[in-house]
Amino acid sequence: MRQHVNPLSRNFNEIERIPALIEMFGDSKSNLHLDIGCAAGEFLFDLALINTNWNYIGIEIRERLVKTAKLKVRERDIKNLYFIFGNANNILHDVQSKFIFKNVKSISFNFPDPWFKKRHYKRRVIQPEFLNLLSNSLQKGSLIFIKTDVKDLFDYMDCIISNNFNFKKIDKNDFNFSESFNPSQVKTNREKYVIVNQLDIFERIYIKI
C-alpha cells in the first residue's frame, strides 16, 4: 500500500541543494527526462541502464525512498540518473532549479497519488499553477506524459493540461517512442500490477507548442 504524504506540509518549504547538471551526470549535455513522483525509482533504474543516451531525474516526496535510490545509484555507479527529495512544485519553482529546464525534453507523471476526497484535490501534483510553470519554462517540443488507473484523476489532469493553450494532445498511435525517453516502453511497477489485474489504464501525451 502506497503511503500518501501531504505535499502542502511546511516540511517541504525548505529545498535541498540542487547540484549543477555537470555534478549529477557523466554527460551533462544529454537530453533530460524528469519523472515526478518516482517512488523507489525502479522505473528510472531500468530506463537509465537501457537508454544510456538520456539523463534521468526522479523527484519523490518520501525521503526514505530517495535515500535508498541515491545509495543504489552510487553502488551501481550509474552516471545518467539522479534523485531529488521534496515537493516537485516547490523544487521546480525554486530559482536554484531553473537550470534544469535547459535540457528537459520530457516529463512523466506515472500513477500519481490520486487524493480521492474532493477537499484534497489541491494536493494532487498537477495544478494550474504548476502547469503555468512548465508552460513558461519548457522549450517548444517538450513532452508531458500522464498515466493513471484512476479515471477521475485522469480527467482532472487532462482538464488542467488541456486548458493551458501552450500544450496540445498527441495521438499515442502516431507517437514515435523510439526517439523518446522510453524507447523500449519500460513499465512502472504499478503499471505491471494494473495489467496483471486487468484494470484500465488512462494515459495521454502532450507537446509544448
Swiss-Prot record:
Q: Give me the reactions it catalyses.
A: guanosine(46) in tRNA + S-adenosyl-L-methionine = N(7)-methylguanosine(46) in tRNA + S-adenosyl-L-homocysteine
Which NCBIfam families does the protein's record reference? tRNA (guanosine(46)-N7)-methyltransferase TrmB
Catalytic residues at: 113
Q: What is this protein called?
A: tRNA (guanine-N(7)-)-methyltransferase
Ordered alphabetically, the record's keywords are: Methyltransferase, S-adenosyl-L-methionine, Transferase, tRNA processing
For this chain, the family text in UniProt reads: Belongs to the class I-like SAM-binding methyltransferase superfamily. TrmB family.
> Pfam families given for it?
Methyltransf_4
Pathway(s) the chain acts in: tRNA modification; N(7)-methylguanine-tRNA biosynthesis
Q: What is the lineage of its organism?
A: Bacteria, Bacillati, Cyanobacteriota, Cyanophyceae, Synechococcales
Report the HAMAP family cross-referenced here. Answer: tRNA_methyltr_TrmB
Cellular compartments per GO CC? tRNA methyltransferase complex
